[in-house]
């Protein structure tokens, strides 16, 4: 979906000077005007519902170009090469691929003074070393969804899903072998980004032992299985949990830690509006704008000043925010690793499924 916000005065002037009437009765624009008009438009790409019309209007105040808002529903719909993005908001796993391909520019942090509002925990990342290319706007985490009536207290440990037969036949795991192995690594007390074969072999053994107790390995949606009463425990992202309307289903962050995902802003190298693009990102980090994004999405904000002025109900939502001790054990991850590691994970996952 494309939304355009243009200054009426400028548009009228273009209309008067840029169009000519030909003898055939067809109105055409000179070729030079196409280039001129493109140069006066700044394209922002974002997930659907990420940026409200009001926010786009706020951004318009800090640039002279007309803003063209392009939204997408999934990474496969971004169409990076054809949309001439000046600012792009995307999930970390997708942006890492663009960074690796050399398509994302390094940011000039001097042009983004509001970057000082970002929690220091996010100043580095596994997918963007030294945070040279991206600015985090929103984040969430993988945790445990459970049926409350089956538990006397929240099952806040991976043990019940990965290392116990107490809930045999009532557990839904992920169908993503790499993420599941990373979660097993966190349960064992090591970094989910380790590539040490010894630890990864231990994770494989753990999952093989537990397989007999698992109802589903990602073939079905874990939340749907919970709602239908087929399982009592499932691995889900808190982003997906927020739309559940069943009061008997809860969400908890495991104390061992887990995986964090981030939605970030960046500037493609193809942008010719570098300064204005930096101004847009800086405006996104304005506390009021950042607060609006976070409360609208009901996902966590890494912006300390935005959190400070947010509603109490948002700040105290335990589905959005883990407590301070647990969040320290959460990690982001890189999806681009060496070939040997990828082959090892793929082979181990096949072994787990075939066991």
Model-derived features: where do they sit?
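N-terminal secretory signal peptides
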Residues: 1-10, 24
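A bilobed periplasmic-binding-protein/Venus flytrap-type ligand-binding module shared by bacterial periplasmic
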Residues: 143-150, 186-187, 262-277, 281-283, ...
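Extracytoplasmic ligand-binding site segments that recognize negatively charged/polar headgroups
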Residues: 92-213, 218-227
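C-terminal capping/gating helix-and-loop segments adjacent to ligand/active sites or protein-protein/ligand interfaces
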Residues: 71, 291-355
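Early extracytoplasmic/lumenal segment of secretory-pathway proteins
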Residues: 35-97
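A ligand-binding cleft/hinge motif common to bilobed small-molecule-binding domains
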Residues: 94-99, 227-228, 233-248
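Periplasmic-binding protein-like
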Residues: 55, 117, 140, 169-178, 200-209, 245-269, 283-308
